[in-house]
A protein has these predicted regions:
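Specific transmembrane helices
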Residues: 2-146, 174, 244-294
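Alpha-helical transmembrane segments and their helix-entry boundary regions
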Residues: 11-15, 92-93, 156, 170-171, ...
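Hydrophobic residues within alpha-helical transmembrane segments
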Residues: 20, 98, 173-180, 205, ...
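Membrane-interfacial alpha-helical segments at the cytosolic side of multi-pass membrane proteins
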Residues: 32, 156-164, 192, 246-247
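Transmembrane alpha-helix/helix-exit interface in multi-pass inner-membrane proteins
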Residues: 104-113, 149-150, 169-191
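Hydrophobic/aromatic residues in alpha-helical transmembrane segments
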Residues: 106, 157, 214-218, 270
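Membrane-interface helix/loop boundary segments of multi-pass membrane proteins
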Residues: 148-180, 223-228
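Functionally important transmembrane alpha-helices
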Residues: 196-265
């Protein structure tokens, strides 16, 4: 079989298995009539078992595909890119943290202008009282998105699609796939996607657009780190626990609406501006191109 055709078939198979298994598992509690009112990754109810296992499908499927379809050198390199940072990784992590903090600031300034309450910062307050809470939030923050998804989305999927001359198209495609993969979350009352859809279905659909704009930032960090997946874990972590998570909770309904628009605009602006810098262009030139398929 032609290697290009083989790569395409493997890619399509990965997407079909990942999306269908996630949807099957995360819709199963509703099919079984289980109580999902408070279900989340950390709720410890029976429905959360299906919810959690469904959520790890991108990573689980991606790792299996790497083990099955990559050469031994490819497997070693995959693990190294996931767990061993380089200088670019550290720069990408700092840029990610800075971008997310600016997005929080802008979102809250707009929200306050619209009459919203101040942010609660309960997570930060808990850490200030007991620093051990830092590890609690770090644990749930890492497994609730970074580890459960990014070995697949940015590890395997981006590996298969990476083309230096088509990074914009690739990023938007991955972001769209990533967005629709979240479909079951619209039906779980404890998830912010459910809140958005209840406020306005259009707002719920804009979440997919926000995934596409976020994917532009993810790809930028991926390039800066010379295709390391390591810093992507932190970008996803920062978005989960800072932008709309425990560090700033509770936040107003106004904030939860405004943040969607701010994230889309600022992520897009970051991509447009940063990808025109000499720093990024040099990183792109140095980013390795490889294909480890057997």
């Amino acid at each position: 079989m032609d290697k290009t055709a083989k790569s395409r078939r493997i890619l399509i198979l990965y997407l079909i298995i990942t999306i269908l298994l996630t949807w099957l598992l995360q819709f199963m509690p509703m099919i079984l009539g289980l109580d999902i009112e408070n279900t989340s990754i950390s709720s410890f109810d029976f429905a959360s078992l299906f919810f959690g296992i469904g959520g790890v499908m991108p990573t689980l499927t991606g790792v299996i595909f790497v083990l099955v379809f990559y050469t031994k050198d490819g497997i070693k390199d995959f693990l190294k890119r996931c767990f061993v940072p380089n200088k670019g990784s550290l720069i990408a992590i700092l840029l990610s943290l800075g971008l997310i903090c600016v997005e929080v600031f802008v979102t809250q300034m707009i929200s306050r202008g619209l009459g919203a309450a101040k942010l609660g910062f309960e997570g930060l307050k808990l850490i200030a009282k007991n620093p051990l809470y830092f590890f609690y939030f770090l644990f749930w923050g890492i497994i609730s998105g970074p580890f459960s998804e990014e070995f697949g989305w940015r590890g395997f999927l981006t590996d298969r699609l990476f083309r230096k001359e088509k990074l914009l198209q690739v990023s938007l495609l991955i972001g769209f796939i990533w967005g629709i993969w979240h479909l079951p979350l619209y039906f779980y009352p404890a998830q912010i996607q459910h809140d958005w859809f209840m406020i306005n279905p259009l707002l719920g659909l804009l979440f997919i657009v926000s995934c596409m704009s976020a994917a532009l930032v993810y790809m930028t960090m991926y390039v800066i780190a010379k295709r390391k997946v390591f810093p992507i874990f932190f970008l996803h972590l920062f978005k989960n626990i800072i932008l709309t998570g425990a560090m700033i909770y509770p936040f107003s309904d106004t904030y939860s609406v405004v943040v969607v628009f701010v994230e889309i605009v600022m992520d897009t602006l970051f991509y447009v501006i940063f990808t025109r810098t000499l720093f990024y262009k040099k990183a792109l030139e140095q980013a390795p191109e490889f294909d480890y398929l057997k």
